[in-house]
Amino acid sequence: MPPRRKRVSSAPRRRRRTYRRTTAHKHQERPVHRRRRRRH
């Protein structure tokens, strides 16, 4: 049984960086993100 990684600590930090830094790249890959950003 491999040790479980703690994603709770990294999740919030990675989400904020991805949204701001890879905005263009994100909506190019998944259009869903673009719709969510517009509603936000």
UniProtKB/Swiss-Prot annotation:
Compartments, record wording: Nucleus; Chromosome
Superkingdom is Eukaryota
Q: Name one GO cellular component term.
A: nucleosome
Q: Which tissues carry this protein?
A: Testis.
Where in this protein does the record put region Disordered? 1-40
Annotated GO biological processes are: cell differentiation; chromosome condensation; spermatogenesis
* Range of residues in the leader sequence: none
Entry keyword set? Chromosome, Developmental protein, Differentiation, DNA condensation, DNA-binding, Nucleosome core, Nucleus, Spermatogenesis
> Principal place where this protein is found?
nucleus
Q: State whether keyword Nucleus applies.
A: yes
Output the Gene Ontology terms for molecular function.
Answer: DNA binding
What the protein does?
Protamines substitute for histones in the chromatin of sperm during the haploid phase of spermatogenesis. They compact sperm DNA into a highly condensed, stable and inactive complex.
- What's the protein here called? Protamine-2
* Natural source organism: Bufo japonicus (Japanese common toad)
From the broadest rank down, the organism's phylogenetic lineage runs:
Eukaryota, Metazoa, Chordata, Craniata, Vertebrata
